[in-house]
Amino acid sequence: YNQALMDLGATICTPQAPDCPVCPLTTTCQARDLGLQTQRPVLMPRPALPHITVTAAIIQRDSQVLITQRPPHGLLGGLWEFPGGKLQEGETLPDCLQREIREELDVTVEVGSQAGVYRHAYTHFRLTLHAFFCRLLSGEPRPLQVAALRWVQPAELGTYPMGKVDRQIALSLLKT
């Protein structure tokens, strides 16, 4: 019965052009009785997706770059990424990146030029990532809020599983 109703809606009673004269439900259709058949179904507006701004650091040492592994649980769990995090209210992008790197890796970085801006839409939110080239000022990276960290050659980045945005950053490094 359900499949038959769905077929009816897909072929005869379409939202933009219902074909009432050939519909087998004409005698029981309330929308037709009220003259509202072209106004059905009523589409509800979708709520706006939240937008999240994040930063990422491309920390270079010699010919290598630093990548970190996300904790195993949660969004993109276990994938590798360039370290960074969410922008907080009232924070500048460089301040955000310095704070996140300090919290995640216990090091201080100097934020340099912007490497790129990357956008991605997830199911429940939209993301804009600002990537910056950074230089270590003090400390040796330790995995405080990440599962692991590695210094890798840019050519090796393709061997690490990454989310789409981080993969775009990795590909851009191979082009430079």
Predicted regions and their residues:
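Acidic pyrophosphate-coordinating catalytic loop
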Residues: R46-P50, H73, Y118-L129
